[in-house]
Structure formats: C-alpha cells, structure tokens
C-alpha cells in the first residue's frame, strides 16, 4: 500500500487580541469555549474531557482545570482581553472565571446569560431522596 506523499498546507494561526469566554456550567459538567468577537471558536475544553468522570465532573476544581486548558490553548492565538459569558447554575461558575483571570487574561466584563423561561416548558419534577 503506497503512502500518501502529498504536501499539506499548514493553517496559518490568526492573531486575535480580544475574545469571549463562554462558560456553560450545568449540574453534571462544565464546558468552556473561547471564541473571537464573531463567535468563531478558538479553543474549548470540558471537565469530562480532562479525565474527570461521574460526580467529580461537576466539581469546581474540574471546571478550573477545564478553564485552564481552554485558556492556554487560546493564548496561542494571542488573546489578551476577554469578556466572560456564564450560563447555567452549576458549581463550576466562579472557579472557571477565577482560573481564566489567574492565567493572565484581562477580564473586561462578566455577564450572566442563563436562559430564564417566561413560563415556558414544564419543569422536571422535584427529586425525592
């Protein structure tokens, strides 16, 4: 079987100075996505993807690790300033924002964009433990 010897073009890394960090914190997992101003994803990470499984996925430490991984990947694009959009009620909200600040990002604003229904779909029944 012959090997494919065609040369592949390297994709040039864009230089982006400002970005938006989308933090989706659910009760089961935390997803951190860093995008440019137009919404094109530069880097993303999840607490489940960092090796945390089961109930450890939903811890603040797992969200912190996911934010660090996504933040380091976005720094390769030259991102310095970020706006943070936090969505969801999960336990990883604050720790993910703190982790991004500790990486050296200048956090311009923090916004809560959790969707709140104006009496939409019926909520799931309450747990009886």
Swiss-Prot record:
InterPro entries: Ribosomal_uS11, Ribosomal_uS11_bac-type, Ribosomal_uS11_CS, Ribosomal_uS11_sf. Keywords: Ribonucleoprotein, Ribosomal protein, RNA-binding, rRNA-binding. The keyword tRNA processing does not apply. Pfam families: Ribosomal_S11. One of its GO terms (molecular function) is rRNA binding. One of its GO terms (cellular component) is ribosome. GO terms for biological process: translation. It comes from the Bacteria. Transmembrane segments: none annotated. Part of the 30S ribosomal subunit. Interacts with proteins S7 and S18. Binds to IF-3. Located on the platform of the 30S subunit, it bridges several disparate RNA helices of the 16S rRNA. Forms part of the Shine-Dalgarno cleft in the 70S ribosome. Belongs to the universal ribosomal protein uS11 family. This is Small ribosomal subunit protein uS11. It comes from Psychrobacter arcticus (strain DSM 17307 / VKM B-2377 / 273-4). The gene is rpsK.
């Amino acid at each position: 079987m012959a090997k494919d010897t065609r040369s592949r073009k390297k994709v040039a890394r864009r230089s982006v100075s400002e970005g938006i960090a989308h933090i989706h914190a659910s009760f089961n997992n935390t997803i951190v996505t860093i995008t440019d101003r137009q919404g094109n994803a530069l880097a993303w990470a999840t607490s489940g993807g960092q090796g945390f499984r089961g109930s450890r996925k939903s811890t603040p430490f797992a969200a912190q690790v996911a934010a660090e991984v996504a933040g380091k990947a976005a720094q390769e694009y030259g991102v310095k300033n970020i706006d943070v959009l936090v969505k969801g009620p999960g336990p990883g909200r604050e720790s993910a924002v703190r982790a991004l600040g500790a990486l050296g990002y200048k956090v311009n604003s923090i916004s809560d964009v959790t969707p709140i229904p104006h009496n939409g779909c019926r909520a799931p029944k309450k747990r009886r433990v």
